[in-house]
Every structure is written in C-alpha cells, then in structure tokens.
Amino acid sequence: MATMENKVICALVLVSMLALGTLAEAQTETCTVAPRERQNCGFPGVTPSQCANKGCCFDDTVRGVPWCFYPNTIDVPPEEECEF
C-alpha cells in the first residue's frame, strides 16, 4: 500500500512541476521600463546588490525617478506546433 501512495505523490509532484514550468515559460521579466513608469522597489540609498536581492532592477542614470524598480512582466505567446 505504501508503494501506491509513493507513486501517487510522485505523480502529483511531477504534474505540479510541469504546470509551474509552463507558467514560467509563459512570462518573462525585463528591466526595460520607461522612467516615468517605474514602480519603486527600494528605499533611499539602496545599492544595486540590495535591489537585485529583492528581484528588482537598478538604473541610476535618470534623476528624479526610482532607481530600484520592479521589472515589467511580459506574456510570451506559446509556440505553435507546425503541422506538416
């Protein structure tokens, strides 16, 4: 009986991993964000490494806007299978 439970658990883990992998492929993040559209992710004086540790983008080339900001999430359309 224990082996059947182990197989069920393994199958559920495998299905969950595949589902999460598909979701991860469907979205990608980019640090290409217009300065006026940046959403603050840091605090005054945040360093590039502190910002990166939060999973955010750092760009201090534009004054008056957040330097540590959330990346844009872009939906990537799934690849279509070609039928020959």
UniProtKB/Swiss-Prot annotation:
<dbReference type="GO" id="GO:0008285">
    <property type="term" value="P:negative regulation of cell population proliferation"/>
</dbReference>
<dbReference type="GO" id="GO:0035902">
    <property type="term" value="P:response to immobilization stress"/>
</dbReference>
<dbReference type="InterPro" id="IPR017957">
    <property type="entry name" value="P_trefoil_CS"/>
</dbReference>
<dbReference type="GO" id="GO:0030277">
    <property type="term" value="P:maintenance of gastrointestinal epithelium"/>
</dbReference>
<dbReference type="GO" id="GO:0005975">
    <property type="term" value="P:carbohydrate metabolic process"/>
</dbReference>
<keyword id="KW-1015">Disulfide bond</keyword>
<dbReference type="Pfam" id="PF00088">
    <property type="entry name" value="Trefoil"/>
</dbReference>
<comment type="function">
    <text>Stabilizer of the mucous gel overlying the gastrointestinal mucosa that provides a physical barrier against various noxious agents. May inhibit the growth of calcium oxalate crystals in urine.</text>
</comment>
<dbReference type="GO" id="GO:0043434">
    <property type="term" value="P:response to peptide hormone"/>
</dbReference>
<dbReference type="GO" id="GO:0008083">
    <property type="term" value="F:growth factor activity"/>
</dbReference>
<dbReference type="InterPro" id="IPR044913">
    <property type="entry name" value="P_trefoil_dom_sf"/>
</dbReference>
<keyword id="KW-0732">Signal</keyword>
<dbReference type="InterPro" id="IPR000519">
    <property type="entry name" value="P_trefoil_dom"/>
</dbReference>
<dbReference type="GO" id="GO:0008283">
    <property type="term" value="P:cell population proliferation"/>
</dbReference>
<feature type="disulfide bond">
    <location>
        <begin position="51"/>
        <end position="68"/>
    </location>
</feature>
<dbReference type="GO" id="GO:0030154">
    <property type="term" value="P:cell differentiation"/>
</dbReference>
<keyword id="KW-0339">Growth factor</keyword>
<keyword id="KW-0964">Secreted</keyword>
<comment type="subunit">
    <text>Heterodimer with GKN2; disulfide linked.</text>
</comment>
<feature type="disulfide bond">
    <location>
        <begin position="41"/>
        <end position="56"/>
    </location>
</feature>
<protein>
    <recommendedName>
        <fullName>Trefoil factor 1</fullName>
    </recommendedName>
</protein>
<dbReference type="GO" id="GO:0005615">
    <property type="term" value="C:extracellular space"/>
</dbReference>
<dbReference type="GO" id="GO:0005576">
    <property type="term" value="C:extracellular region"/>
</dbReference>
<dbReference type="InterPro" id="IPR017994">
    <property type="entry name" value="P_trefoil_chordata"/>
</dbReference>
<feature type="disulfide bond">
    <location>
        <begin position="31"/>
        <end position="57"/>
    </location>
</feature>
<dbReference type="GO" id="GO:0010039">
    <property type="term" value="P:response to iron ion"/>
</dbReference>
<feature type="domain" description="P-type">
    <location>
        <begin position="29"/>
        <end position="72"/>
    </location>
</feature>
<feature type="signal peptide">
    <location>
        <begin position="1"/>
        <end position="24"/>
    </location>
</feature>
